[in-house]
Amino acid sequence: RQFKPVDQGAWLYMAELNPEEPWKLISDPVLLSMPEYGWANNHTFVDEGPFALITEKKIFLTFSSAAVDSTYVVGLLSADPEADLLDPKSWIKENYPLMSSRSKEGEYGTGHNSYIMDEDGLVWNAYHGKPGVDGPRSSGLRRVHFGADGYPVLDLTEEKDLAPGLTEVSMDVVVK
């Protein structure tokens, strides 16, 4: 196993695009992320498939790392909205994955996610995982919660998604 990452074409770079011709770069690409942690460089050196989640206080960029097997994970970069996003120093990389094979029992290799906002303003995480270590890739959808620090929480199980005391609702209706 190699321990020093080698760029094989699947690291995260950012550059400014020409607004009139968005297929043309008008700045040099800058490296935002490479697989520098053990959880990110299993079998291959990949940081790929970035997707932005923008809130009032932070810009989050999730990405997938490792091989597309049970080691596949979702990592996180964050930056302040007013920061120079082309400056790599503006981005903070978390040293742990937000989703992994340990996030939910029976779900392996969770990765390559995106976000959807529904008509009620709830944010949902769409991703793929495997029902078994060697199972086929399957789609998953889970509600995104935000911690007290404003960061997304992607690994809540169904049991933790809603407090048990809130699962049953009753009311009295008075008709006059």
Identify the meaning behind each predicted range:
Residues 1-176:
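Carbohydrate-active catalytic/glycan-binding domains of CAZyme proteins
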